[in-house]
């Protein structure tokens, strides 16, 4: 029975390590990047940015796949939030895999699972951006999908958030089609309003800015689901896509016109996006740093990651934090299984040797009696 006990201990240790400890061990290698300029160093904003968790719905994927991958996303996020204690968390779209396919009741269950998985302590905002799997691509967008996303997750087509004097503009990429549709017109109007708000922050003494709430001006940071226009990941200074594919405007990335419009109206200093499921750091069409954030889910990325950004009104530093790779967990369980087989094989060998010795002794006794 000792070998069964040994196998039980081996499997239990592998289980506890992989399911409860490994995330902390891997994530401890990450640290908040440090701002070198001294003006705002005492109180920078620390933002954790992730993308594309793709929580499975009732139609796609096996229930066991959904259970296990979502368990690991929960463990990874809770480990990260405890270790890093961010000031704000942004999720850059495709929160759900079937958000544009489910009924209102199923969507409510989706939101409940999402908020449970990405639960944060009081006082830390979770800002969720709409993705094409949440409300549909432009051709599929419907007031019903849009209104329920806005209602449950408190985010409309375009929003301006100001946290610690840092301005974030959150955009619904699917409303950047520029074809004059209801959603596009509404989004463009909201962008123009935000542009005026930012202008009044910069020039508060202008006559048209008399009634505007006054915040110190700094160039905004752009957050959306689609990256701004680029031909492919060949334009990235660094990336982790396993292969390069050409991007289509309005499907993989924003169009040139939409990208230029955002640059003209907002004049951002930094941009973050998701959608491609792979990491990319590029200097985009607007001449600013853009980070495409890899998927947070093992279902889309076997080596997922997220971003840690330290930001002040006049500076920023961004670093990539690698999460627990799926292959590491599989290899750990495989190693535990092989170790168990070795223990069992060793025990069987001992049993066989013991029986042979016992048989030899019995044979000698029989010969002695004869």
Swiss-Prot record:
Top class in the EC scheme: hydrolase
Annotated Gene Ontology cellular component terms: endoplasmic reticulum-Golgi intermediate compartment; membrane
Places the protein is found: Membrane
Essential cofactor(s): Mn(2+)
TM helices/strands, residue ranges: 7-27, 328-348
A biological process term (GO) from this entry: endoplasmic reticulum to Golgi vesicle-mediated transport
Primary localization: membrane
SUPFAM superfamilies in alphabetical order: Metallo-dependent phosphatases
Known function: Metallophosphoesterase.
Protein name from the UniProt record: Metallophosphoesterase 1 homolog
Record organism: Drosophila melanogaster
Encoding gene (name): PGAP5
């Amino acid at each position: 029975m000792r070998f069964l006990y040994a196998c039980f201990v081996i499997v239990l240790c592998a289980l506890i390590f992989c399911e409860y400890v490994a995330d902390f061990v891997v994530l401890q290698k990450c640290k908040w990047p440090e701002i070198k300029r001294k003006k705002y160093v005492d109180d920078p904003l620390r933002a954790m940015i992730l993308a594309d968790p793709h929580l499975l719905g009732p139609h796609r994927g096996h229930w066991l796949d959904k259970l296990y991958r979502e368990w690991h996303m929960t463990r990874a996020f809770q480990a990260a939030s405890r270790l890093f204690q961010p000031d704000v968390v942004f999720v850059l779209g495709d929160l759900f895999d079937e958000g544009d396919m489910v009924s209102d009741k199923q969507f409510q269950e989706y939101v409940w699972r999402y908020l449970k998985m990405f639960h944060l302590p009081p006082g830390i905002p979770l800002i969720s951006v709409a993705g094409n799997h949440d409300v549909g691509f432009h051709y599929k967008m419907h007031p019903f999908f849009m209104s329920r996303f806005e209602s449950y997750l408190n985010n409309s087509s375009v929003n301006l958030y100001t946290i610690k004097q840092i301005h974030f503009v959150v955009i619904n990429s699917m409303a950047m089609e520029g074809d004059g549709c209801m959603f596009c017109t509404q989004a463009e109007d909201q962008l123009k309003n935000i542009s005026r708000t930012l202008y009044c922050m910069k020039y508060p003494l202008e006559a048209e800015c008399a009634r505007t709430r006054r915040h110190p001006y700094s160039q905004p940071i752009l957050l959306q689901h689609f990256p701004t226009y680029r031909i492919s990941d060949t334009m990235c200074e660094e990336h982790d896509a396993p292969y390069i594919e050409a991007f289509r405007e309005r499907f993989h990335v924003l169009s040139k016109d939409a990208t230029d419009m955002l640059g003209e109206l907002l004049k951002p200093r930094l941009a973050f996006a998701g959608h491609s499921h792979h990491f990319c750091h590029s200097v985009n069409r607007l001449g600013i740093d853009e980070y495409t954030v890899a998927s947070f889910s093992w279902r889309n990325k076997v080596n997922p990651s997220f971003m840690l950004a330290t930001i002040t009104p006049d500076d920023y530093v961004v670093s990539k934090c690698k999460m627990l790779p799926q292959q590491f967990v599989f290899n750990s369980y495989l190693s535990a299984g092989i170790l168990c087989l070795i223990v069992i094989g060793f025990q069987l060998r001992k049993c066989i040797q013991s029986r042979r010795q016992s048989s030899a002794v019995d044979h000698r006794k029989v010969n002695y009696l004869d």
